[in-house]
């Protein structure tokens, strides 16, 4: 294998180039990187790739017993399909739960006053629990009868 990789370099000669970093390029701050990670997590869990490829409608419609069309946000009985609003709502909940865990982690810093620590713990627990139970509600709307019993 080594010979196979050495073969092109026996024929070609590498140029003597000295590259240096441009002056305007600098290391991003930790908060900028964190914001990019959270935004990309939001978009990926929201199914942005699926939305670009399949181009589903933002919301669907369903005919009720009187023959009227009413909007629905969840594509029921289809695990591998979604409306755009369904993906964004689920993505918001996943992101809120993840941020709740990060808030819970930040509440353990040693220099935080007691009231702020309590508020961080409360907000963290509420966001984690709310996102968990709302995700269960979304699953019940997506697959009726799935989480029963």
Swiss-Prot record:
**What coarse category fits the chief subcellular location reported for this protein?**
membrane
Q: In which family does this protein belong, per the annotation?
A: Belongs to the OSTC family.
Its UniProt pathway annotation is:
Protein modification; protein glycosylation
> What keywords appear on the UniProt entry?
Membrane, Transmembrane, Transmembrane helix
The record lists the membrane-crossing segments as: 33-53, 84-104, 118-138
GO CC term (a single one): oligosaccharyltransferase complex
Q: Which gene encodes it?
A: OSTC
Q: What is its subcellular localisation?
A: Membrane
Organism (species): Gallus gallus (Chicken)
Q: What does this protein do?
A: Specific component of the STT3A-containing form of the oligosaccharyl transferase (OST) complex that catalyzes the initial transfer of a defined glycan (Glc(3)Man(9)GlcNAc(2) in eukaryotes) from the lipid carrier dolichol-pyrophosphate to an asparagine residue within an Asn-X-Ser/Thr consensus motif in nascent polypeptide chains, the first step in protein N-glycosylation. N-glycosylation occurs cotranslationally and the complex associates with the Sec61 complex at the channel-forming translocon complex that mediates protein translocation across the endoplasmic reticulum (ER).
- Protein name, UniProt field: Oligosaccharyltransferase complex subunit OSTC
